[in-house]
């Protein structure tokens, strides 16, 4: 209803506007007619003069001038023709001006194209471009200032042609009622039909229902399941995991901050104030007396303890160097101003190396037996940019005896890396390089003594009675034999840490790493342990040598005392005798020297990496040592050493012996090669004849069914000796013992003792029957020629036949069709009397099984099949002796 009211109001407003402009349009038309040189005469009523009616005026907002293309391009004039909507029942024509160049011919319709207008005047030929009729431009509206608003509802369709216009006889004006109806019809046409099939799916639900469903779905998705209540165990695990995470993060932070610090277990860097609160006394290790710690002042534990330390070639003390370091570190935020304090428990050794490995300087302090020498000293650049190279080569020595501190020479010095940002000013002489790789002899035996049993590590282990496995992986021990200073090599001075005399250790303090006992031998133990055994005529001894030892190379520097030292014997077997004779002579002279020096205690450096700990510890106090070689006397020599070194000689002399007996064949292979009746397609070796196993199985069926119902046969059978049958009864004398016992037990053939005795007398107790022709017949013995020659029926007893009905019942159990069973019967039946002999029945059973295996029946049974049944029925089974 609301839409209809709005349409009516719009139509009335348009009608009133058009009526008011009627007078103005008339005046304009009259002026144009006077000024225009193209004036059309009044039209004469004729049927041929059918013109297209003038289009009604459109509203001003929607009206616009339309440019048209005409043949006369020079005279392009834009004109507007408008006519007011005539009143009802008025048939008079309205004069309008026309031009030959352009003409407005736009028609707008809301319903259809059937309502057209008719003009009383003829219209000139005007070619309009249909593609431009619907386009309105602002420029055209400015040029056509004379155009007035056209009535939208009175315009016809723009797509209608001129031919349709001339067909209408008269002009049919639009009334306001018609316009209102048109608007209503157009609005109703645009409405969606009230058809359930054309509705959308959402139209079936009201907006409230849709919103409700949406809210419920969102609420269900937003609801999260309530977390389960954690038990006490879960809470405890969570707490432990959090603690572990915090510890791990703290460790990572500490490792990042001090990644270059290697501390032995039990060392703490703390400030003086923290130590005073703990209330325990700190000790500094005294090298002169390794068993007693020396107490020191807490105030001397910081950098102040270096006040009395002076270099030999400089007047500057280490205190000034330390202050300079602290000042520079404060500027660079590298080291900080915190003073370091070292506490040394009694059970741990001191080996601290706080260095920055990223710099070019590597400072390494070597602690020898006196504790007052450093292989690589502390080199530092003074304030003027000069470096004390003498400190780098010879180390820092304590010469100031007037200080209040204790003697530094008796204490372990802690070298601290002095950071210097100016790397270019550091001398290249302090730069270190790696030791060259070991020789071929060392690589051959796979020894790595430079890593595990270096001079520094052995020295520290001996000082503190610790084995290598007690040191943590975070400890950083700079090995002197693993680094060589360039300055020392240039000066030609031997490295202090590489000589054997500088690395001697007391026996009593040495604790060796634990390895397997010497009794547990291994196939390559000779190469690993570096053990060389000699078979001497006078005495037996074992020499423990280190294949990586430097004693052989430095034998000349040790006064020629180590010239007898050799590596592990790698010569050929032919040169062993000569080497042993030379070694015996050398050992005899050396033993005399050792007896003179028994009272003297000689320190040694045990460098054997894989030497047995238990054997050396037990024999250490009994044997003698010299120049890094451990010699065990005959009393302390292991008992198994001589036995093992004799075993290879015996094995070489003993010839190779082969087994006298042949090995048994593989039973599993034999089992596979046998024929499997359930899988006959896997082996075809036994398919052409009967095997012993099959024949025994078929004979069992034969024995169980032979002679049944044969006495009921009324037809005379071929080859049967009826002389053994008397009065319809079968004599038991010609029947096997087993059959005889079966007949007697069933009382089928009763017999008396007299008949048996008479039969035995007539046959002399032999059971041999004499035929009528004088030939001897024995049912127990079958001639192979007769068994194989089936063309001629042999003489058989009635009890040795099996009836055809019984054979059919036995063979029918196989499930084969009767046609197949008939073919098998025809292949084996030679007597043609409805019975089968033993051989015929066995071959028939074999053919039945072959059919069950899937083989085709042959046209004729091969002779090899009949030959496989030959023999006297005696089988000899040979069992293998175990």
Swiss-Prot record:
Pfam family for this entry, one: EH
Keyword field: Lipid metabolism
Record domain EH: where: 783-872
Ranges of biased composition (kind: Acidic residues): 575-610
Top-rank taxon, per record: Eukaryota
Keyword Oxidoreductase: no
Domain annotation EF-hand: ranges: 816-851
Bias type Polar residues, positions: 26-36, 99-114, 384-393, 616-627
The UniProt record lists the keyword Lipid metabolism: yes
Region (Disordered): 15-36, 69-148, 217-238, 378-409, 424-448, 567-674, 748-769
Transmembrane annotation, as ranges: none
Single GO term (MF): calcium ion binding
SUPFAM superfamilies cross-referenced by the UniProt entry: EF-hand (SSF47473)
GO CC terms in record: cytoplasm; plasma membrane
Role this protein plays: Positive regulator of phosphatidylinositol 4,5-bisphosphate turnover and negatively regulates signaling through the cell integrity pathway. Involved in rDNA silencing.
Record protein name field: Increased rDNA silencing protein 4
Organism whose genome encodes this protein: Lodderomyces elongisporus (strain ATCC 11503 / CBS 2605 / JCM 1781 / NBRC 1676 / NRRL YB-4239) (Yeast)
Gene this chain is encoded by: IRS4
């Amino acid at each position: 209803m609301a839409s209809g009211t709005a349409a009516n109001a719009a139509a009335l407003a348009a009608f009133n506007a058009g009526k008011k402009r009627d007078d103005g349009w008339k005046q304009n038309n009259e002026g144009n007619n006077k000024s225009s040189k193209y004036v059309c005469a009044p039209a004469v009523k004729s049927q041929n003069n059918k013109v297209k009616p003038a289009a009604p005026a459109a509203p001003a907002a929607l009206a616009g001038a339309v440019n048209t293309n005409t043949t006369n391009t020079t005279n392009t004039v834009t004109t507007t023709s408008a006519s007011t909507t005539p009143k009802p029942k008025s048939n008079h024509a309205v004069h309008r001006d026309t031009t030959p160049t352009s003409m407005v011919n736009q028609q707008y319709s809301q319903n259809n194209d059937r309502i057209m207008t008719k003009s009383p005047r003829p219209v000139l030929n005007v070619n309009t471009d249909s593609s431009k009729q619907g386009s309105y431009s602002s420029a055209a509206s400015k040029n056509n200032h004379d155009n007035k608003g056209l009535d939208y509802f009175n315009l016809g369709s723009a797509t209608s042609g001129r031919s349709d216009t001339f067909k209408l006889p008269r002009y049919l004006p639009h009334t306001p009622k018609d316009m209102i109806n048109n608007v209503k019809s157009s609005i109703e046409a645009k409405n969606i039909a009230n058809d359930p099939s054309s509705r959308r799916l959402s139209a079936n639900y009201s907006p409230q229902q849709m919103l409700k469903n949406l809210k419920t779905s969102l609420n269900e998705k937003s609801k999260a399941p309530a977390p389960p209540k954690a038990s006490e165990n879960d809470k405890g695990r969570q707490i432990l995991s959090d603690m572990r995470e915090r510890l791990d993060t703290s460790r990572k932070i500490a490792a990042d901050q001090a990644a270059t610090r290697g501390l032995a277990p039990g060392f703490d860097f703390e400030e003086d104030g923290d130590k005073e609160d703990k209330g325990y006394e700190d000790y500094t290790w005294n090298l002169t007396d390794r068993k007693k710690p020396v107490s020191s002042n807490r105030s001397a534990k910081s950098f102040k303890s270096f006040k009395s330390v002076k270099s030999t070639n400089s007047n500057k003390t280490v205190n000034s160097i330390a202050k300079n370091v602290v000042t520079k570190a404060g500027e660079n935020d590298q080291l900080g101003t915190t003073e370091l304090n070292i506490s040394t428990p009694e059970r741990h050794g001191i080996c601290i190396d706080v260095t920055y490995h990223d710099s070019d300087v590597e400072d390494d302090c070597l602690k020898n037996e006196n504790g007052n020498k450093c292989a690589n000293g502390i080199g530092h650049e003074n304030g003027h940019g000069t470096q004390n190279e003498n400190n780098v080569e010879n180390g820092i020595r304590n010469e100031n005896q007037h200080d209040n501190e204790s003697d530094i020479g008796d204490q372990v010095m802690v070298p601290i890396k002095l950071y210097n940002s100016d790397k270019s000013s550091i001398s290249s002489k302090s730069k270190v390089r790696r030791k060259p790789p070991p020789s071929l002899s060392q690589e051959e035996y796979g020894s790595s003594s430079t890593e595990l049993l270096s001079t520094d590590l052995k020295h520290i282990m001996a000082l503190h009675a610790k084995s290598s496995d007690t040191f943590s992986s975070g400890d950083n021990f700079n090995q002197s034999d693993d680094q060589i200073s360039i300055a020392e090599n240039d000066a030609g001075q031997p490295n202090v840490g590489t000589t054997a005399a500088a690395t001697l250790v007391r026996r009593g303090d040495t604790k060796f790493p634990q390895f397997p006992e010497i009794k547990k031998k291994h196939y390559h133990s000779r190469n690993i342990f570096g053990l060389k055994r000699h078979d001497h005529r006078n005495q037996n001894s074992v020499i423990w040598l280190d294949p990586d030892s430097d004693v052989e190379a430095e034998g000349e520097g040790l006064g020629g005392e180590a010239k007898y030292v050799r590596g592990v014997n790698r010569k050929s077997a032919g040169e062993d005798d000569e080497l042993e004779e030379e070694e015996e002579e050398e050992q005899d002279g050396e033993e005399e020297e050792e007896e003179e020096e028994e009272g003297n205690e000689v320190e040694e450096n045990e460098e054997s990496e894989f030497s047995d700990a238990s054997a050396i510890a037990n024999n250490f106090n009994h044997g003698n040592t010299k120049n890094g070689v451990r010699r065990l006397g005959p009393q302390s020599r292991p008992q198994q050493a001589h036995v093992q070194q004799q075993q290879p000689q015996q094995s070489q002399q003993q010839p190779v012996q082969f087994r006298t007996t042949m090995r048994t064949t593989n039973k599993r292979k034999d089992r596979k090669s046998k024929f499997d009746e359930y899988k006959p397609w896997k082996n075809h070796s036994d398919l052409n004849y009967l095997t012993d196993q099959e024949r025994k199985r078929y004979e069992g069926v034969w024995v169980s069914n032979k002679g049944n119902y044969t006495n009921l046969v009324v037809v005379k059978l071929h080859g049967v000796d009826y002389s053994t049958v008397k009065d319809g009864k079968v004599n038991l004398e010609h029947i096997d013992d087993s059959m005889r016992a079966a007949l007697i037990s069933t009382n089928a053939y009763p017999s008396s003792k007299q008949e048996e005795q008479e039969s035995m007398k007539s046959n002399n107790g032999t059971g041999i029957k004499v035929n009528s022709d004088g030939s001897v017949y024995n049912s127990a013995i079958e001639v192979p020629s007769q068994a194989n020659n089936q063309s001629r029926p042999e003489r058989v007893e009635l009890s040795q036949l099996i009836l055809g009905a019984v054979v059919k019942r036995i063979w029918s159990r196989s499930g084969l069709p009767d046609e197949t069973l008939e073919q098998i019967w025809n292949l084996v039946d030679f007597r043609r009397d409805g019975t089968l002999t033993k051989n015929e029945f066995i071959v028939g059973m074999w053919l039945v099984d072959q059919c069950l295996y899937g083989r085709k029946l042959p046209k004729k049974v091969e002779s090899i099949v009949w030959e496989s049944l030959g023999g006297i029925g005696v089988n000899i089974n040979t069992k293998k002796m175990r």
